[in-house]
Curated annotation (Swiss-Prot):
InterPro entries: Ribosomal_uS2, Ribosomal_uS2_bac/mit/plastid, Ribosomal_uS2_CS, Ribosomal_uS2_flav_dom_sf
Top-level lineage group: Bacteria
Protein name as catalogued: Small ribosomal subunit protein uS2
Single GO MF descriptor: structural constituent of ribosome
Keyword entries, A-Z: Ribonucleoprotein, Ribosomal protein
Residue ranges crossing the lipid bilayer per the database entry: none
Length: 331
C-alpha cells in the first residue's frame, strides 16, 4: 500500500479550481488564487497539488502511529461523503450539527456517548419489552437524536489526533476547539475562507459534490495506507496473516465460535480495536481470538454474542469494521 496518487487533471475534472465570486473573497487567500474568470476566483492548483499531498502524508503518518482521524463535514453535500469515507478507513466522523464542547468538554460528551450505548443495548435487548409502547418510542427518539450527533464518534475512545475539515467557515467552532487543544487541522480552504490557524491548508472548492467526494476518498485512502504501514512496522508477517487452518479450542464460546488454541505466528495487537484495553484483549485471547481476521469474519449476531462475553456488546460492530480494514490491508 502507498500514499494515494492523484493528478491535476482529476482536480480540474472535479472542479477543485473553482472558488467563490470575487467580491466574496477573503484577502488572506490571495497567495493561493491564480486569477479571475467571469467574476469567479480560480484557485492555483499548482499550489493545491503539493499542499494536498502534504495533508495526505500527515493523515497517513498519524494513523501509522496509532492516531485517530476525525472527519468533520456537516454541510448537506458533505454529509454522506464524510461518513462513508470515515467508515471505510475505520476512523470517526461528525456529519450532523457540531455540538459545542465536542473536543474541549470531552468528559460531558463521553457521558452522552455512554447514554447512547445504554439506549442501544436497551432497545436491542429484551429489556425494551418492559416499557410501554409510548416509552419505547420516547427512548427511540432520544437514541436517534444522540446518534445523529455522536454516532460517528461513539467508538473513538478519546480525543482525535488530527481532524479533517470540509468548509472552515461552517466548521469554525470545531476548528477553534482543535486549536485550543493543539490538535492539528487539515482543511479544504476556499477563496472566501481564512487559512490562519489551519495546520495543513488545502486550497480548493469546498462546495462542489465531486470535489468533496475526491477529497474524502483521498483522505480515506491515506488513512488506510497508515494502517498498512502500522502493521508493517509492528513486524506482522503479511504472509502469515492470511487465514490459517482453524485449530479448535477444547471448548467453544457460547456463541458457537471456534477459536484457536494459540496465535498463528505473531498475535495481532487487539488493543488497536476501539475501546479494547489490555484486560479486554486477554478476554479475547481466552476465547481463542488472537488475530484481526478472526473478528473480520464474524457475522452480526456472533460478534454481539462475543461482545457480551467480553463485556462490551455495544462495540461489536465497530470491532468487526476495524478488523476488516486491518485485514484487508494485510492481504
Amino acid at each position: 500500500m502507498a500514499l494515494p496518487d492523484f493528478t491535476m487533471r482529476q482536480l480540474l475534472e472535479a472542479g477543485v479550481h473553482f472558488g467563490h465570486q470575487s467580491h466574496r473573497w477573503n484577502p488572506k487567500m490571495a497567495p493561493f488564487i491564480f486569477g479571475t474568470r467571469n467574476n469567479i476566483h480560480i484557485v492555483d492548483l499548482a499550489q493545491t497539488v503539493p499542499m494536498l499531498h502534504h495533508a495526505l502524508q500527515a493523515v497517513s503518518d498519524t494513523v501509522a502511529k496509532g492516531g485517530r482521524i476525525l472527519f468533520v463535514g456537516t454541510k448537506r453535500q458533505a454529509q454522506d461523503g464524510v461518513a462513508d469515507a470515515a467508515k471505510r478507513c475505520a476512523q470517526y466522523f461528525v456529519n450532523s450539527r457540531w455540538l459545542g464542547g465536542t473536543l474541549t468538554n470531552w468528559k460531558t460528551i463521553s457521558a452522552s456517548i455512554k447514554r447512547l450505548r445504554h439506549l442501544d443495548d436497551v432497545l436491542a435487548g429484551g429489556e425494551a419489552n418492559s416499557y410501554t409502547k409510548k416509552e419505547r418510542l420516547t427512548l427511540q427518539r432520544e437514541r436517534d437524536k444522540l446518534d445523529r450527533s455522536l454516532g460517528g464518534i461513539k467508538d473513538m475512545g478519546g480525543l482525535p489526533d488530527l481532524i479533517f475539515v470540509i468548509d472552515t467557515n461552517k466548521e469554525d467552532i470545531a476548528i477553534q476547539e482543535a486549536q485550543r487543544l493543539n490538535i492539528p487541522v487539515a482543511a479544504i480552504v476556499d477563496t472566501n475562507s481564512d487559512p490562519k490557524g489551519i495546520t495543513y491548508v488545502v486550497p480548493g472548492n469546498d462546495d462542489a459534490g465531486r470535489a468533496i467526494s475526491l477529497y474524502c476518498d483521498l483522505i480515506a485512502r491515506a488513512a488506510i495506507d497508515g494502517i498498512s504501514r502500522a502493521q508493517g512496522d509492528s513486524g506482522i508477517d503479511i504472509g502469515a496473516s492470511a487465514r490459517p487452518l482453524a485449530e479448535e479450542l477444547p471448548a467453544a464460546s457460547s456463541s458457537g465460535f471456534q477459536g484457536l488454541a494459540g496465535p498463528r505466528g505473531t498475535a495481532d495487537d487487539l488493543k488497536k480495536l476501539p475501546g479494547v484495553s489490555g484486560a479486554i484483549e486477554k478476554k479475547f485471547n481466552d476465547l481463542g481470538i488472537f488475530h484481526f481476521w478472526q473478528l473480520a469474519e464474524l457475522d452480526h449476531d456472533t460478534a454481539h454474542t462475543i461482545g457480551e462475553e467480553v463485556g462490551l456488546p455495544s462495540r461489536a460492530d465497530a470491532w468487526v469494521a476495524k478488523a476488516k480494514a486491518l485485514t484487508a490491508e494485510a492481504e
